[in-house]
């Protein structure tokens, strides 16, 4: 047994008393569902709730397939020392996952230069750092629900919307020095020097505000509400800060800029059959999500950066988007957690990165098909060998689609590390799926590999429904809308080449800067750590309603 394997510690803990490489095991001797402290808690609550609601049947673990035929495994959240029950990684049971999704949905970036040009050129009003600071005070009053223009306007209780605020950033160091530090996202402080210079060169002298609409708003409404909520308060705040007349024609320009022209949303609108507005998970492109995650600011390890992106994306795309928005089921959690528990994907990715570093060097070779074939084959065969050598590893990833996703993710990321190219990376993924199917005759459930069979040819297509650079693809890309166990890993492959190159951002420098924000409840520098805290019930979310409900409820 090779003790260097990253996943062995977790396997020994999960299957205590069984060697990871043991070929034989036992069944029906572990206590059934009662071996799980969480399921016992569920049962106790369910009995009380059933009585409370007049005997209407409720949760009963004795219904259906017998639970606990084997060990009901704990899961180690990869990159942490936290062992948690699988139930606590379901997004409904995990406040951190909920907050991560909310923090994305409630964010909108709005350019300020159009509004400033209207003020100066149409209205003859001077815009200075002092007036910008005054405006930012006004928007931080109005955005949470404070009135600024009219009397007799109802307002929102600040205690319900403490998480709501607006911040500002710019690529102009001179302007940044003059802005109120309380509301400034300081690129020079938040990013390593080389990354900061790269970001500022892209942003230039332009100025942007980042608005965080209250969590409770996106819980009650949806992501499509966010730009409207933001725009209304922007208009009111400009009127207040610059002493404008609410009815004059120039106000229409503010409205157009705040609602449309200068708006950067986190996700695009969905087609009618999926019926979701902008800023919903299904519209978040893979490169956009890679920029939302902030690990690249604090780590120069390409594998770690990519793994953190995959973990957060697993919760967003597989658990919440496909698992609930699109499917409505509870079973998608296990597909997602395969990518961020028990250090299994970590082991495969670090093996691949070491192979690449030794043979090619990080970003040390051109993206050719020979390189894709070599790296993807090596990493895929290594991954499959681990499942064959360690039966407990096979039991941990009990589904073929879990194994296919994890092996292919490692192959794709490793190929991207070598080439600094996401197209090569995604072709590494596609080759891995084909190799895996050749080895095992199948991957996962029927149709799991539909998108993988046509993927390589589409990666080089220019047809609008087939070809798109990988970073700009997302859950809404036609062939990617089908199956679980793909989208999170695609996000990691979008991140991997940029992490290898040391890029400051993946797709959009504005989104990268907007989430370099220490005041967000979810820690985007370390999604796995936050998710673990949520599973351990140690994460404090935003948007709670205690102030307006009866005490003791």
Swiss-Prot record:
SUPFAM superfamilies in UniProt: Methyl-coenzyme M reductase alpha and beta chain C-terminal domain, Methyl-coenzyme M reductase subunits
Entry note: cofactor: Binds 2 coenzyme F430 non-covalently per MCR complex. Coenzyme F430 is a yellow nickel porphinoid. Methyl-coenzyme-M reductase is activated when the enzyme-bound coenzyme F430 is reduced to the Ni(I) oxidation state.
GO terms for MF: coenzyme-B sulfoethylthiotransferase activity; metal ion binding
Keywords: Metal-binding, Methanogenesis, Methylation, Nickel, Transferase
Pros-methylhistidine PTM positions: 260
Catalysis performed (reactions): coenzyme B + methyl-coenzyme M = methane + coenzyme M-coenzyme B heterodisulfide
Keyword Iron: no
UniProt cofactor(s): coenzyme F430
Single Gene Ontology BP annotation: methanogenesis
Record protein name field: Methyl-coenzyme M reductase II subunit alpha
Gene: mrtA
